[in-house]
Amino acid sequence: MSAKVGVLLSGGVDSAVALYLLIEKGYEVTAYHMKTVRDELYITKQIKHKVCCSPSDTHDAQLIAKKFGVPFKIIHVEDVFKEKIIDYFISENLAGKTPNPCFFCNDYIKFGFVMDVALSDGMDFVASGHYARILNGKLYRALDKEKDQSYFLASIKKEKLSKILLPNGEYSKETIRDIAERAGIHVAKKIDSQDLCFLPDNDFKSFFEERGVKIEPGNIITSEGKIIGKHEGLPFYTIGQRKLGVAAGQKLYVKAKNVEGNFIVVSPLDEVYQNEMRVKNLNIYVDLPDEFLATVKIRKKFKEVPCRVEYLKDELKVQFLEPVFAVTPGQIAVFYNEDEVLCSGVIE
């Protein structure tokens, strides 16, 4: 009897090809499509950039499932998504941090709520179109390093990895699109999602206004304490940001955000580099020694740097072997040994 796999089918090319590859390997596939926010969000807004989980994605996912003759289930996760992802996003922003909701969506929603539904339906495995690899119960980067998504999957608990299949991890994005073309999948050339599903076009101001969250303006000050302008609200800025709307006579970058005083500290470029950080809320994949060397990635588009790590049981004390720009509280740090993911956590 063939193993049963629940494929997280978004309506994009990656998950469509993952579904196709698993069918070709002889698995018995069921498609699971999740709805994170109400369709009205996409209907009432003029959205410029592609986002996931929209009504058009649902339509595409239905067509893909129909083409391959597999059962199709829509899973409504709006309530748990609001509780675990949107509310977290708001609270972290109000605390002066820069959160990464996609990281936690993979843990709580895709490989949490939806995975639980699929397994309770009798699925043996859950699969997605993510670019990463799981080998012998361990998480690794994809072979295509440009498209690798192990950074975002490093929130998934270790014990779940044995139940997850990532067929795309062995292929390049170009090859995935070629496979889609040859298989006659209609979304072969569909563009990738660019923005957060609940925050189209990164319209932060409308997002907070619509939820009745009052964002107060405040002062922009230099490291010496001189007021040089006004900011529109702390959530609209992040560490390392340069476009501040103030004329200072030199290039200044956001160095810190002070929630109590509601002010932003700016400084020249060299002052925004750090030599160390602390990381909490750990998700650990291997037995960590008290001290170890690794490379660390501190945001999506970031060149990893080597570091020395001290494991203090509930947190990591990280010493960079070279200065790092814009270490941002609330963002995710993922630690690697070559291609293997060692652990992850939230930057303090």
Curated annotation (Swiss-Prot):
Secretion signal, residue range per the UniProt entry: none
Residue ranges, annotated region (Interaction with tRNA): 147-149
Chemical reaction(s) catalysed: S-sulfanyl-L-cysteinyl-[protein] + uridine(34) in tRNA + AH2 + ATP = 2-thiouridine(34) in tRNA + L-cysteinyl-[protein] + A + AMP + diphosphate + H(+)
Localization of this protein: Cytoplasm
Disulfide bond entries: 105-197
Enzyme class: transferase
Matching Pfam families: tRNA_Me_trans, tRNA_Me_trans_C, tRNA_Me_trans_M
Positions marked as site (Interaction with tRNA): 130, 331
Family: Belongs to the MnmA/TRMU family.
UniProt function note: Catalyzes the 2-thiolation of uridine at the wobble position (U34) of tRNA, leading to the formation of s(2)U34.
HAMAP family named in the record: tRNA_thiouridyl_MnmA
Name of the molecule in the record: tRNA-specific 2-thiouridylase MnmA
Organism encoding this protein: Fervidobacterium nodosum (strain ATCC 35602 / DSM 5306 / Rt17-B1)
Organism classification: Bacteria, Thermotogati, Thermotogota, Thermotogae, Thermotogales
